[in-house]
Regions:
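Single, function-defining residue in the core of a domain
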Residues: 3-10, 17-342
């Protein structure tokens, strides 16, 4: 929803991803905003709707309070390029990586320049090879320190007047500019990300750019969510909305993780799960996440059905399982083996 007259709902998801491999771990939070207010898995009651960045900042603070035992780096797209929110997160000691808007101005070497102009003047070195839209691309990295001094223009309304809050003088904020550039074998530029971060300098720019590459690939996870039962208005229920959101999200995480897992055993598991879905796949392409999700749904429902089949004894009085039960045991052993692949 982009304005008050829109019809629908908004879903904001926080997904925990392994920084080393880029594989999903679990959905940490779901925040659903509809006509009744804001529902979140991070709190029990319903709250008033907030702007996108206010809601995100609130969720980030609550996620940090979970104390999961690891240092969190919050990766945010271009909407997060706001000095007000960068400063708010930084003063709390929270770490973030945000894609900057190239038209915004920063101070670099004592001069005020657009972020894109600073990126144009940097020298790049290819550090790694990554997948980009189904083909290989070189990932070149360059970085530099910049200072953000522009005024803050938060998208908030004054509670008394209802008008948008006026621009506020901002505090200067020194951050690291990391520019990631993708190019093909002939040197043609395929894409560029200008990233701003307050993560300490002891980490190399390649590692920080890789994090955003993981975030960019996560888009496929959210596309899977949109096509996997998150049509809330069709559920015809009100009591278990958030529980269903988390179940669907976890199923999407499992399918997404399996689709990206390497190794011969994982490849066989993907082929088998895809065959269960009944969907056709191109020979040269890896099995798609929608087909894997459909196959997993069939597998789990089948296992559930077979596991509930009553145990019976044969006429001779033996308590050994009948063939159907042996089939169940075979399926369960196969499922346990499949889980170990992940």
């Amino acid at each position: 929803m982009s304005h008050g007259r829109d019809i629908g709902y908004e879903l904001q998801s926080s997904l925990l991803v392994d920084a080393a491999s880029g594989l999903p771990v679990a959905p940490l939070a779901q925040t659903l905003t509809d006509s009744a207010g804001c529902h979140s898995t991070l709190k029990d009651d319903t709250s008033a709707p907030q702007t996108h960045m206010d809601a995100l900042t609130t969720d980030i603070t609550r996620l940090e309070a979970l104390d999961i035992g690891k240092t969190l780096v919050h990766i945010i797209d271009r909407e997060g390029d706001s000095i007000a929110y960068m400063w708010e997160l930084s003063v709390q000691g929270l770490r973030w990586l945000i894609r900057g808007k190239e038209g915004h101005r920063v101070q670099y070497k004592g001069e005020t320049q657009k972020l894109g102009e600073v990126a144009d003047g940097l020298e790049f070195t290819v550090r790694a090879e990554v997948d980009y839209k189904g083909r290989k691309a070189g990932l070149a990295i360059s970085e530099a320190p910049v200072i953000i001094t522009r005024v803050a223009r938060p998208k908030r309304s004054d509670k008394e007047t209802g008008r948008r809050i006026k621009a506020q003088p901002g505090h200067s904020l020194t951050v690291r500019l990391v520019v990631a550039q993708l190019s093909d074998n002939e040197g043609r530029v395929l894409g560029r990300w200008t990233l701003l971060t307050n993560v300490e300098d002891k980490l190399c720019g390649e590692e920080r750019a890789q994090w955003y590459y993981w975030r960019w690939s996560i888009e496929s996870f959210f596309k899977l969510i949109k096509g996997a039962g998150h049509n809330v208005e069709a559920w015809l229920q009100h009591s278990a909305v958030l529980r269903r959101l988390l179940i669907v999200s976890m199923a999407c995480v499992l399918a997404w993780r399996l689709q990206r897992a390497e190794g011969e055993e994982n490849a066989r598991a993907r082929q088998w799960i895809c065959r269960l879905s009944g969907r056709q796949q191109k020979r040269s392409r890896r099995e798609s996440t929608p087909s894997l999700l459909a196959g997993l749904a069939i597998l789990l429902n089948t296992l559930k059905l077979l596991s509930e089949y009553p145990r019976r004894t044969d006429p001779a009085g033996s308590k050994s399982p009948v063939p159907v039960r042996r089939c169940v045991d075979t399926y369960v052993r196969g499922w346990d083996a499949f889980i170990t692949f992940l």
